[in-house]
Amino acid sequence: MATSSQLLPNGNLSRNGKTKTEDGEEVEAVVGARAAGADAGVALTGRLTGHPSTSGTFMKLKTYLLALRPWSLSASLVPTLLGSALAYRSQWAEEFSLATFFLTAFTVVTVHCAGNVVNTYFDFIKGIDKQKADDRTLVDHILTKDEVVSLGAILYMAGCGGFVLLAVLSPAKMEHLALIYFGGLSSSFLYTGGIGFKYIALGDLVILILFGPISVLFAFMSQTGHLDWTTMGYAIPLALNTEAILHSNNTRDADNDRRAGIVTLAILIGRTASHVLYAMLLFAPYSLFFIFGLKYSLWFLLPLVTLPQAFQIEKRFRNEQTMHLVPRQTAKLNFFFGILYVVACCCAHQLPTFGLRRN
């Protein structure tokens, strides 16, 4: 039978899909449209050495991780920390459990990740995420639509599994926990799926409530088994700062969103008013901390150390050339700002009182 030969760039001879090395040993060449460049080199090395490469698996896991938008997770993690800290400082502190804390954090963050994935899917389906989109997961075909759907389903199932364990360990009534948890889960889906709150200018309201009062109340109740509505007052600084993340994102994407036919608060009020609103959301929490610091404890002045960074971010918001950096930088600020607030709540001799009734 006739054979075909081809001289490879390295000077080796290829016959019928086999490569002859300088030592005279023949190995199968890596072929296929997607096995090129570095991937082909890794695959060929694996065949020669007998050790399969793990780089492909690692890169896939990294891709899935990036699809979760980990930079945004401070919006759900910090309220959970705050609610847990308030539980530790409350009259029901003897109920505090580290196992409950970790399960609460896992449950809340997992649902947040699932909501991010759902957001990625529906933004792409509706033609909102295009070539200039910040989220490249589906735009650049990093993951397929089926993979994104599967990832979202797995995350929701994992969150529900965490909730079941939490319900077993928590002293709270099952119906109270379920009401808040499944309300939050539904909101994370309906933000872009189904009703699509994001697309009818209600996304800001959902985020303001969900990643503030609701998350703090859920974490507090999971630990203590009690409803304390004063915890919602403590959530106000975090809720405002978290809304600043979303508003900066929507302001940056306003032109693209308008072309896609959706309506956000940033589109309704325009660029100038959006800048004013962003500044209010960014700096109002610092005013609250200043008041708390003077009236209750100097510990509440601790988050003010992040104020210079807030001014830098606000300056970038006003510049079209640096506007694209603002959402992630605001999220980073939210994390450090929130952690310092939690530390203040843990260390302060006296906590603020909001005059609300406890149950």
Swiss-Prot record:
Composition skew (Polar residues), residue ranges: 1-16
Single GO molecular function: prenyltransferase activity
Signal peptide per UniProt: none
Enzyme class: transferase
CDD domains with a match to the protein in the record: PT_UbiA_UBIAD1 (cd13962)
Coarse class of the protein's main subcellular location: mitochondrion
Lineage: superkingdom: Eukaryota
Region (Disordered), start-end ranges: 1-23
Membrane topology: Multi-pass membrane protein
EC number of the protein: 2.5.1.-
Keywords from the named record: Membrane, Menaquinone biosynthesis, Mitochondrion, Prenyltransferase, Transferase, Transmembrane, Transmembrane helix
GO CC annotation terms, alphabetical: endoplasmic reticulum; endoplasmic reticulum membrane; Golgi membrane; membrane; mitochondrial membrane; mitochondrion
Biological processes, Gene Ontology terms: larval lymph gland hemopoiesis; menaquinone biosynthetic process; mitochondrion organization; negative regulation of hemocyte differentiation; negative regulation of hemocyte proliferation; negative regulation of lamellocyte differentiation; vitamin K biosynthetic process
Compartment(s) of residence: Mitochondrion membrane
Membrane-spanning intervals of the chain: 67-89, 98-118, 148-168, 177-197, 200-220, 262-284, 289-311, 335-355
Pathway(s) per entry: Quinol/quinone metabolism; menaquinone biosynthesis
Keyword Transmembrane appears in the UniProt entry: yes
Family: Belongs to the UbiA prenyltransferase family.
Free-text function comment from the UniProt entry: Prenyltransferase that mediates the formation of menaquinone-4 (MK-4), a vitamin K2 isoform, thereby acting as a mitochondrial electron carrier. Mediates the conversion of phylloquinone (PK) into MK-4, probably by cleaving the side chain of phylloquinone (PK) to release 2-methyl-1,4-naphthoquinone (menadione; K3) and then prenylating it with geranylgeranyl pyrophosphate (GGPP) to form MK-4. MK-4 acts as a membrane electron carrier downstream of a electron transport chain complex, improving mitochondrial oxygen consumption.
UniProt protein name: UbiA prenyltransferase domain-containing protein 1 homolog
Organism of this sequence: Drosophila melanogaster
Lineage, uppermost ranks: Eukaryota, Metazoa, Ecdysozoa, Arthropoda, Hexapoda
Gene: heix
